[in-house]
Amino acid sequence: MAKDLNDSGFPPKRKPLLRPQRSDFTANSSTTMNVNANTRGRGRQKQEGGKGSSRSPSLHSPKSWIRSASATGILGLRRPELAHSHSHAPSTGTPAGGNRSPLRRSTANATPVETGRSLTDGDINNVVDVLPSFEMYNTLHRHIPQGNVDPDRHDFPPSYQEANNSTATGAAGSSADLSHQSLSTDALGATRSSSTSNLENLIPLRTEHHSIAAHQSTAVDEDSLDIPPILDDLNDTDNIFIDKLYTLPKMSTPIEITIKTTKHAPIPHVKPEEESILKEYTSGDLIHGFITIENKSQANLKFEMFYVTLESYISIIDKVKSKRTIKRFLRMVDLSASWSYSKIALGSGVDFIPADVDYDGSVFGLNNSRVLEPGVKYKKFFIFKLPLQLLDVTCKQEHFSHCLLPPSFGIDKYRNNCKYSGIKVNRVLGCGHLGTKGSPILTNDMSDDNLSINYTIDARIVGKDQKASKLYIMKEREYNLRVIPFGFDANVVGERTTMSQLNDITKLVQERLDALRKIFQRLEKKEPITNRDIHGADLSGTIDDSIESDSQEILQRKLDQLHIKNRNNYLVNYNDLKLGHDLDNGRSGNSGHNTDTSRAWGPFVESELKYKLKNKSNSSSFLNFSHFLNSSSSSMSSSSNAGKNNHDLTGNKERTGLILVKAKIPKQGLPYWAPSLLRKTNVFESKSKHDQENWVRLSELIPEDVKKPLEKLDLQLTCIESDNSLPHDPPEIQSITTELICITAKSDNSIPIKLNSELLMNKEKLTSIKALYDDFHSKICEYETKFNKNFLELNELYNMNRGDRRPKELKFTDFITSQLFNDIESICNLKVSVHNLSNIFKKQVSTLKQHSKHALSEDSISHTGNGSSSSPSSASLTPVTSSSKSSLFLPSGSSSTSLKFTDQIVHKWVRIAPLQYKRDINVNLEFNKDIKETLIPSFESCLCCRFYCVRVMIKFENHLGVAKIDIPISVRQVTK
């Protein structure tokens, strides 16, 4: 039986890691994590005597806070109104005047406590969202405490202080010999770095490169040397960072772990209602559940640590390079669910008694001895709260869109020895899974087998081989979640354009290559190498050769300056915002023929179509509008007839001109679309009370005009006739069709710039950019080889004029850092896939609204103006009409449909100037009912992105051609 934490104690010769404030402290006391942290500090002062106390820099440095570490709350800090309501709740078996919480179960019996109200969907949802202290996280969960093997080893609380540069340098290496660092990628494609940072640059999540070759199992962390581990007085040889938990070997042990999610917070001695396998979580939702651990053997099994985490990662497979890249962008540790010496209050507020027996025979908690007894099933409750956004340090380049939660995308078919590789999409249901809870859900979201974004709840038991003194994973289990984040807009005010970011990186790379060429010229001439040669022209005159300067640090500051410019508050012209100027030329075009109109339209895209028609007959009208009207009327303006006589004298028998198509980039977005089975399971009514309140609260943050789903696109056609062309009516539209374009991009290194659909759809431009960076990559590799070959000679020239000063090493990373090299590789390895979906939207005729004839007539009159007016001022609003009996687009005899189509969608040409006409088009966007694809929300992360465009194709009569325009739109989940 598990050891009750209320008993006298802890194992012999072992002291509790969380020291009590009072001598009568018991495990059932409800204390805050910050109190525990302060207590540890006092305990450490006692041990060290007169050394004095050192305050942790993390308490004063917001950058060091682990904001997403856990959703674990503190019962003592619960809302006052909740505590007040609980204080009046009846409790059986509690003495009068007792101070027992109504949420605690009495030890006298095993029946649930009566609180006077439902705990499943009421007060339990008032979760206290208080984060644990940094010291507690670092002590308990960043390091795995040792001592189970050696009973004489004590895990004393550490003291925290900033690491000195000398300490970090000494730890890296003590050799005084000059050594250079190579940037060449090894067999796994990972780069090495020697850059350092201080304690404030806490980046707990990293990108890993794994080999998928059969003969290799190496895992390389591309950031492992960029960000040194957090230093404290713990012996690193006796502890392991949680960041390296994924590299531990796995052993087969007779331990069974089960993970189950529940609709509400589990209550002791009450059977919970399990959550559906098709549940979709969104930003701010609570994830409740419990974990059971059972030793199936006949002997005791010792373990070192037990972790319960909510993790998210991106997996990219490169079969050509036999490489698997993993980017972990979220890891939340539930301190109350993981093992610790003391009981930590649950974030849900539900209390339990350690070592008590639940309704299913399981024992609450894990004992302090860290021993799994045979035949005993242990249970731990967990609760996680999905964040609204990620930590700022998630993206090195500081892109806001990279710090938003991406949606679940594809499935990781290479995890756990390809455990999920057999999952296929059911054509009828539109999704597929293994049929067991915890299985990932595969939908037709246009992802390939080599790219996935995954959310999992992971439980891991870490053990230690007593003979080899090596840590290993005794057992691990994952529970896959489907997460569709709330539709926050990733386009922020003041964000720089894609091309401006790319140009800055290009200039920096060219400057670094110029510096390398300069030192090689110095090498040929045997001339001394100065700091000016290394730092480039922009720092000439500011860096003196006598000054001790760190070249790598200077280059890193240049990169940091580029990243600072990526922030959304960089040089915002608020006057332009008021005028409606376009802030992102990378996403939209600027019309040169009408600046005022461009300001009124705001962000827009445009395309053009040149047309050329031969003269077929002497008819006064070659093109007509009866295609939609099915009527036989004929009229032309007197100005057109007069112009015809003048143009006939030139002898030109052709009609030529230019059609410009311009479209607004809408603020609204298309709604997230999932298979019907998922939609029915995740309706608003099926959510818990907390999740419903969370959804309403998030919806209030979105403006009403943005919250409304995108239902139509506004286009404007401008027809400009050539000066030497025969007079003619502007071309008539034969048909309008729409299709949805899905653009997916990925790279196995962090993408340094913010991408957009226009760049990814422009194959010619993207190819030229990749060719340029391929050239950069080859030159860097060439220069690195030459640098390594002449390493000693270059350092002699660099230290030639240093005199009596200590020699200083010149490294290749002084010119090209690993981060800059990764940026170049990322652009070189950028891959784009495009899917054209033609069956997403209904045909335009099927979207027509039913209006009365009176309303229809008024709409037509108000749009075209009074055509009978002959004054010059009204001539600019004169609609152009002509005659024909063509009906290629609409069924014959549907004159009412033709009128509605003209009035609601295509409207009529309006003459606005000599030889210039304008026409407004409203393209309706309505989903078909039988969509088989899943439209996940638009997103952009460090390794991959998904964008959408609506392609509108306007086909003109008489084989004139088709005008195409791709309008960037977003897909969001903002409505239920």
UniProtKB/Swiss-Prot annotation:
<dbReference type="GO" id="GO:0006513">
    <property type="term" value="P:protein monoubiquitination"/>
</dbReference>
<feature type="compositionally biased region" description="Low complexity">
    <location>
        <begin position="53"/>
        <end position="64"/>
    </location>
</feature>
<comment type="function">
    <text>Component of a RSP5 ubiquitin ligase complex which specifies polyubiquitination and intracellular trafficking of the general amino acid permease GAP1 as well as other permeases such as PMA1. The RSP5-BUL1/2 complex is also necessary for the heat-shock element (HSE)-mediated gene expression, nitrogen starvation GLN3-dependent transcription and pressure-induced differential regulation of the 2 tryptophan permeases TAT1 and TAT2.</text>
</comment>
<dbReference type="Pfam" id="PF04425">
    <property type="entry name" value="Bul1_N"/>
</dbReference>
<feature type="modified residue" description="Phosphoserine">
    <location>
        <position position="58"/>
    </location>
</feature>
<dbReference type="GO" id="GO:0043162">
    <property type="term" value="P:ubiquitin-dependent protein catabolic process via the multivesicular body sorting pathway"/>
</dbReference>
<dbReference type="GO" id="GO:2000397">
    <property type="term" value="P:positive regulation of ubiquitin-dependent endocytosis"/>
</dbReference>
<dbReference type="GO" id="GO:0000209">
    <property type="term" value="P:protein polyubiquitination"/>
</dbReference>
<feature type="short sequence motif" description="PY-motif">
    <location>
        <begin position="156"/>
        <end position="160"/>
    </location>
</feature>
<dbReference type="InterPro" id="IPR039634">
    <property type="entry name" value="Bul1-like"/>
</dbReference>
<feature type="region of interest" description="Disordered">
    <location>
        <begin position="1"/>
        <end position="65"/>
    </location>
</feature>
<comment type="subunit">
    <text>Component of the RSP5-BUL1/2 ubiquitin ligase complex composed of at least RSP5 and BUL1 or BUL2.</text>
</comment>
<dbReference type="GO" id="GO:0034450">
    <property type="term" value="F:ubiquitin-ubiquitin ligase activity"/>
</dbReference>
<protein>
    <recommendedName>
        <fullName>Ubiquitin ligase-binding protein BUL1</fullName>
    </recommendedName>
</protein>
<feature type="region of interest" description="Disordered">
    <location>
        <begin position="82"/>
        <end position="124"/>
    </location>
</feature>
<feature type="region of interest" description="Disordered">
    <location>
        <begin position="145"/>
        <end position="196"/>
    </location>
</feature>
<feature type="compositionally biased region" description="Polar residues">
    <location>
        <begin position="177"/>
        <end position="196"/>
    </location>
</feature>
<comment type="pathway">
    <text>Protein modification; protein ubiquitination.</text>
</comment>
<dbReference type="InterPro" id="IPR022794">
    <property type="entry name" value="Bul1_C"/>
</dbReference>
<keyword id="KW-0833">Ubl conjugation pathway</keyword>
<dbReference type="GO" id="GO:0000151">
    <property type="term" value="C:ubiquitin ligase complex"/>
</dbReference>
<dbReference type="InterPro" id="IPR007519">
    <property type="entry name" value="Bul1_N"/>
</dbReference>
<dbReference type="GO" id="GO:0070086">
    <property type="term" value="P:ubiquitin-dependent endocytosis"/>
</dbReference>
<feature type="modified residue" description="Phosphoserine">
    <location>
        <position position="70"/>
    </location>
</feature>
<feature type="region of interest" description="Disordered">
    <location>
        <begin position="857"/>
        <end position="878"/>
    </location>
</feature>
<comment type="similarity">
    <text>Belongs to the BUL1 family.</text>
</comment>
<dbReference type="GO" id="GO:0000001">
    <property type="term" value="P:mitochondrion inheritance"/>
</dbReference>
<keyword id="KW-0677">Repeat</keyword>
<keyword id="KW-0597">Phosphoprotein</keyword>
<dbReference type="GO" id="GO:0005737">
    <property type="term" value="C:cytoplasm"/>
</dbReference>
<feature type="compositionally biased region" description="Low complexity">
    <location>
        <begin position="163"/>
        <end position="176"/>
    </location>
</feature>
<dbReference type="GO" id="GO:1990306">
    <property type="term" value="C:RSP5-BUL ubiquitin ligase complex"/>
</dbReference>
<feature type="compositionally biased region" description="Low complexity">
    <location>
        <begin position="862"/>
        <end position="878"/>
    </location>
</feature>
<dbReference type="Pfam" id="PF04426">
    <property type="entry name" value="Bul1_C"/>
</dbReference>
<dbReference type="GO" id="GO:0009749">
    <property type="term" value="P:response to glucose"/>
</dbReference>
<feature type="compositionally biased region" description="Polar residues">
    <location>
        <begin position="23"/>
        <end position="39"/>
    </location>
</feature>
<dbReference type="GO" id="GO:1904669">
    <property type="term" value="P:ATP export"/>
</dbReference>
<keyword id="KW-0963">Cytoplasm</keyword>
